[in-house]
């Protein structure tokens, strides 16, 4: 069984996750924490999964976060980003017409090619390679998962 640390900024979502956790996990351990996923207090990891954690970051900031995580990660990191496309760009422009309180949280569309370029050029990720990548689409939800492995 794996030892898992699940981190989210929202104490409300962390509490909800605790309530929904299965009672029997087998041989592993699951710890829910409200905080910053980039904090070094969580220790080292074999694998990191960051689902929709970085969709609000511009590509250089996103890669900076990955480099911070890479310092404490041994094997792989899987993360999602908002892939840029003309439909999403139009939706964001229309969304900006609404009052700020009525808008969904802002996402930062990122080109896969541009993201690959920033990853390849970042010294903190020199030992990491892009692995699998897959677009995820369900209804209005669209993201792209990317794997980095050392």
Where do the model's predicted regions map?
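Hydrophobic adenine-recognition pocket in adenosine-nucleotide-binding enzymes
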Residues: 53
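A short, conserved alpha-helix within the catalytic core of class I
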Residues: 57-69
């Amino acid at each position: 069984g794996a030892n898992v640390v699940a981190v989210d900024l929202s104490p409300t979502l962390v509490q909800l996750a605790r309530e929904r956790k299965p009672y029997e996990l087998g041989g592993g351990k699951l710890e829910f924490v409200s905080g910053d996923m980039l904090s070094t207090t969580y220790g080292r990891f074999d694998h990191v999964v960051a689902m929709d954690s970085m969709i609000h970051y511009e590509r250089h900031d996103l890669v900076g976060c990955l480099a911070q995580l890479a310092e404490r990660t041994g094997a792989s990191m899987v993360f999602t980003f908002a892939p840029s496309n003309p439909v999403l760009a139009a939706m964001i422009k229309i969304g900006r017409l609404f009052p700020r309180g009525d808008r969904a949280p802002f996402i930062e569309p990122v080109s896969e090619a541009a993201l690959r370029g920033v990853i390849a050029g970042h010294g903190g990720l020199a030992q990491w390679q892009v692995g699998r990548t897959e677009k995820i689409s369900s209804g209005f939800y669209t993201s792209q998962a990317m794997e980095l492995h050392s």
